[in-house]
Amino acid sequence: MKRAVIAGFAAGAAMMVGGALGAVSRSDIKSSDPRTMAEINSETMNPMIGGQAMLPDRDILENIASSPMHSTLVAALKDSGVAAALKTNGQFTVFAPTNAAMAGSTQNKATLARRMSYLIVPGKYDSQALLRLINESGGEARLRTAEGGTLVARMNGPTNIVVMDEKGSTADIAIYDVRDRNGIIHVVDRVLEPNGVARQVAVN
């Protein structure tokens, strides 16, 4: 089966990993803008998380930190040293588990950085990009994470994308396409974890 592999890591990343907003009106668009209204609105609207607005001009860490559903994840990102990379000018896609998903997760300091960077895919992959990759790769898109491992995205029914980790556990995407200045957040209902194989992750 042909598989799409997303490789590489954004240059300059630090540490181990390098209510909806209102739609714009037609009067806000310059006549020279080649984008359609639908394309522009999709770039300027965001879902809310836990009742909090997610602002597209914030970086990923700022938006995650403003979510009441992700305080455990934010603490883990900071403790691991991975948080700094999510404030850079690179482009990242984060599969962000909720507090409820992380409640039973063991916070082993020795492996925390690895586990946090496994949740991050270098590059900007919204739901449309993921769907395109899934279709192009025959039903399963393999995503290379910042940790060096692999996540597998596939369809579960006609509209739902699920993500499987290296241990075979599958997470549903509960909230899609939270757009940030430096990437995309997808809220997931399970912590995605790498396997036990140690990998050397490049530090830029």
Predicted regions and their residues:
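Sec-dependent N-terminal signal peptides
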Residues: 2-22
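Mature, structured domains of secreted/extracytosolic soluble proteins
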Residues: 3-5, 22-204
